[in-house]
Amino acid sequence: MLIEYIQAAMTHAEFEQMENGRYFGTVPPCQGVWADGETVDAMRETLREVLEDWLIVSFRHSIEIPVVDGWDINPKPVAEEYAETHQAA
């Protein structure tokens, strides 16, 4: 599920070439996730790493993670998760 979230978030990546020739990119749904690089590929690779680190920090500090394309990876209380998976038919 985490890999799918990262892939979905990366489809929202926006980037531009700066005046100095480097590339700058962000993932708008994930506030604070940005990177730059000498090439688009280098920037995208760094951007993905920053997104992964941002998720770790968000989990560690119980910061709500935005739902992206239906992917909700926020931790749920055990009782709520149990109720969702064991609903009466």
What are these regions (language model features)?
Residues T11, Y23, V33-A35:
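Structural detector for hydrophobic anchor residues on beta-strands
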Residues M1-H12, E45-A89:
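Short, charged, surface-exposed hinge/linker loops at domain edges
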Residues A9-M10, Q17-N20, V40-A42:
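Short secondary-structure boundary micro-motifs
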